[in-house]
């Protein structure tokens, strides 16, 4: 279910402060965050945000198409290794 429009988008304050500080300084450093629940705002465009996936920080370069989505959508938490091999030869 989508978030109510009267509430507005959610973003953690500490993440917004870090992005604003980068914009003032003009530096292009990676921002580490554990906040997968934060919505991507237009002022994030062009920055790289390292989102925690439960094991490591996955670098996510924010583009214009990502605005309005959550940061966690771009850092998958599960790694798919593939299905098991067919063991028909060993069963004989």
Curated annotation (Swiss-Prot):
Gene3D superfamilies referenced in this protein's UniProt entry, alphabetically: 30s Ribosomal Protein S19, Chain A
Gene Ontology biological-process annotations: ribosomal small subunit assembly; translation
Database matches in PROSITE patterns: RIBOSOMAL_S19 (PS00323)
Domain of life: Bacteria
Ranges that cross the membrane: none
One term under GO cellular component: cytoplasm
Keyword list, A-Z: Ribonucleoprotein, Ribosomal protein, RNA-binding, rRNA-binding
Cited HAMAP family: Ribosomal_uS19
Function per UniProt: Protein S19 forms a complex with S13 that binds strongly to the 16S ribosomal RNA.
Similarity comment text for this entry: Belongs to the universal ribosomal protein uS19 family.
Protein name: Small ribosomal subunit protein uS19
């Amino acid at each position: 279910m989508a978030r109510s429009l009267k509430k507005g988008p959610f973003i953690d304050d500490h993440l917004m402060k870090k992005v604003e500080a980068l914009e003032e300084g003009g530096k292009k450093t990676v921002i580490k965050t554990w906040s997968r629940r934060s919505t991507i705002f237009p002022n994030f465009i062009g920055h790289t945000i390292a989102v925690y996936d439960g094991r490591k920080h996955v670098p996510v370069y924010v583009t214009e198409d990502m605005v309005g989505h959550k940061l966690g959508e771009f850092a998958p938490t599960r790694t798919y290794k593939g299905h098991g091999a067919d063991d028909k030869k060993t069963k004989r």
